[in-house]
């Protein structure tokens, strides 16, 4: 959206040169994503300060005038994005897109090429949204189930409901591809965003850099297990709203299940025409049926 990337003269960041891009239109700012700087993919993300300012201004503009003085916008920011760890996770999300561009540039391009289909997706179809809700409820149940056989059974049910939704809703091959592409692109990035925070929180020998120790919004990842649970719960809340955010969460949840049933799945995820749902189907088809405490097999 701007001019060529240029090395910032007479300055370095952590001993390395860094780049800037002149904007030709102040109304057209770069999105949070990955950019190609020369022949290198790199993450791009608003600074934490600018993100906060943009949130305050944008949120207030969406409110009716009479509500603007009384809605606690600053409190909402702290609840949604206030922790520094959350910002670091978002940066990991965008860095993962750069990794996708490095490892599988063709797949990244195809997934981005599919993005305009969002405007034609049947977000407002009531029957489709009801089917999506059932699908996501079962996906959440699979992710949170304790016994592996129960989780596998829920995962198989999720895949069956997905197939039935597409069939009964006469979803075109183009739209099916759109779902799969966006889950691969954004679902995997969401997975990376959350898992890296969870792993940091579980580390027993983590010590933050001194420079971040004085940040009052940084909690050394101690709040990340709670954040993980909150983010998993969002899987069930993705219907009855337009926009592709649901693919972030449905893709992420499939990644969590793949970790459970086939830990080597990540190497396969880069191959052409390999989708998360296909990897999951293969992973759970051999799992034993779930048997309840009463000895009854759950179908």
Question: Positions of the model-derived regions?
Answer:
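Non-catalytic terminal regions of proteins
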Residues: 1, 236-299
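Auxiliary, metal-adjacent structural segments of Zn-dependent hydrolase domains
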Residues: 1-70, 84, 105-111
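Post-HExxH zinc-binding segment in Zn-dependent metallohydrolases
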Residues: 29, 102-171, 175, 179-226
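Short pre-active-site segment immediately N-terminal to the catalytic Zn-binding motif
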Residues: 72-91
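Glycine- and acidic
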Residues: 73-77, 170-178, 235-240
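Active-site recognition of the HExxH zinc-binding catalytic motif
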Residues: 89-102, 190
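Extracytoplasmic/secreted envelope proteins and their assembly/folding machinery
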Residues: 92, 186, 190-193, 251, ...
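Extended hydrophobic/aromatic segments used for targeting, binding, or gating
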Residues: 200-258
């Amino acid at each position: 959206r701007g001019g060529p990337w240029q090395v910032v003269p007479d300055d370095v960041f952590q001993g390395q040169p860094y780049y800037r891009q002149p904007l030709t239109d102040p109304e057209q700012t770069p999105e949070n994503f990955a950019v190609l700087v020369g022949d290198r993919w790199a993450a791009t993300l608003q600074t934490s300060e600018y993100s906060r300012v943009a949130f305050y201004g944008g949120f207030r503009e969406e409110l009716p005038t009479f509500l603007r003085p009384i809605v606690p916008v600053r409190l909402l920011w702290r609840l949604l994005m206030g922790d520094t760890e959350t910002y670091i996770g978002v940066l990991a999300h965008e860095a993962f897109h750069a990794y996708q561009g490095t490892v599988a540039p063709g797949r990244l391009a195809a997934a981005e090429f599919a993005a305009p289909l969002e405007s034609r997706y049947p977000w407002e179809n009531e029957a489709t949204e009801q089917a999506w809700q059932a699908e996501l409820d079962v996906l959440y149940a699979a992710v949170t189930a304790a016994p592996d056989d129960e989780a596998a059974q829920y995962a198989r049910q999720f895949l069956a409901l997905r197939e039935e939704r597409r069939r009964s809703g006469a979803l075109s091959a183009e739209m099916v591809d759109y779902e799969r592409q966006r889950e691969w692109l954004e679902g995997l990035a969401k997975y990376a965003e959350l898992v890296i925070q969870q792993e940091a929180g579980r580390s027993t020998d983590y010590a933050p850099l001194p420079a971040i120790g004085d940040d009052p919004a940084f909690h050394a990842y101690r709040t990340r297990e709670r954040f993980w649970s909150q983010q998993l719960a969002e899987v069930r809340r993705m219907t009855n709203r337009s926009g592709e955010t649901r693919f972030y969460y449905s893709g992420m949840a499939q990644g969590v299940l793949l970790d459970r049933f086939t830990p080597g799945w990540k190497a396969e995820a880069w191959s052409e025409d390999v989708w998360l749902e296909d990897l999951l189907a293969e992973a759970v088809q051999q799992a034993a049926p779930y048997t309840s405490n009463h000895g009854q097999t759950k179908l």
